[in-house]
Amino acid sequence: MFCVIYRSSKRDQTYLYVEKKDDFSRVPEDLMKGFGQPTLAMILPLDGRKKLVNADLEKVKQALTDQGYYLQLPPPPEDLLKQHLSAPGENKPDAKS
């Protein structure tokens, strides 16, 4: 099984996986409007030889079979302040001061 991966022209780090090149017939019209003009990113075999970066291989395969597409959204932004405040360390302000 292969999939064709397209990059969104409207949303950064958003990708659409479909089974066949330029076949968006099973993708909802509203999703395509929000996605913008698809730009071909790559064609990838789904046999497990190559690891997907931000998507689970089995979920992608299941979505392609069930609905004909898989939408990969960007990861949530890192909250560096929250990480800093929750990490133990010597450079934190003393609550007693």
From Swiss-Prot:
Residues covered by region (Disordered): 74-97
Domain of life the protein comes from: Bacteria
Domain YcgL: 1-85
SUPFAM superfamilies on file: YcgL-like
Stored InterPro entries: YcgL-like_sf, YcgL_dom
HAMAP family recorded: UPF0745 (MF_01866)
Protein name: YcgL domain-containing protein CKO_01183
Protein's organism: Citrobacter koseri (strain ATCC BAA-895 / CDC 4225-83 / SGSC4696)
Lineage: Bacteria, Pseudomonadati, Pseudomonadota, Gammaproteobacteria, Enterobacterales
